[in-house]
Amino acid sequence: MVEKTNLASGRVPQDTDLLIVVAPEQLKKKQLFAIDQFLMQGGTVIIAASSWNVRLSSDAISAEKQHSGIEPWLAHHGITIGETLVMDTQLGYFPIPVQRQLGASTVDETRQLAYPYFIDLREENLDTTSGIFAGINQLTMNWVSPLIVDNPALNVTSLFKSSEESWLDREGGIQPDFEKWPASGFDSGEGRERKASELAILASGKFNSWFAGKPVDFDVTPGVSDDGKPVEVIEQSPGGTRLAVIGSGIFLADAVIDLQTQAMGTRYLSSLQF
């Protein structure tokens, strides 16, 4: 059973086996506490978040930088969401609204564009050892930020990465500009460093609480025991606890799935095997 929660109480609902945090915005300490303590109890957490907020409208798309509030907590565990977007020559297609000059008039139309922000992941880009992608040999990721991991205390598995011909965009120019780049509408990445970027990772091991040794200064106690005394903060998780991070949240949005299905046909995976 799937249950939605905003974690505003500072706790994850009882009997939760897997906590998925999708496209978080301006997380408060109580919400971070709920995520943190669920992980410390040995629960599996999946974070799907980017450094960019992508807006879709009927006639344009845009992206602006954002801070979701999850960044300090992830950084505590040695995981950073890069403040860029990954572009790749191994790409998918997107029915995108564009404007075309027709004589003295401007015409709005929709084109099926080769879209470098939709990264077409093939079997060689997907982890085939953990069992998470069992039976999956292709996946498209949308508007994804790269991940940087630096925590030798954890066992880190790359779930999927971009191709060796990918590069990073620091500007967020996700709307095509055919005046500037007539051939494709986008910067080709010429002169940029080309390399594979981590797009999703799975970290496992013992995690230390972000709240360890810190006062819990929000307006409710972390929890109350049967004798009425506050429950202590759990400061370390059991061994083998798992945290997965995906550098995009919008790829799960209904509007994006509908648009991409329209462009590429139904090519969406069933649930991942976490």
Regions found by a protein language model. Name each.
Residues M1-F274:
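Acidic, S/T/G-rich, low-cysteine, solvent-exposed domains in lumenal/extracellular/periplasmic regions
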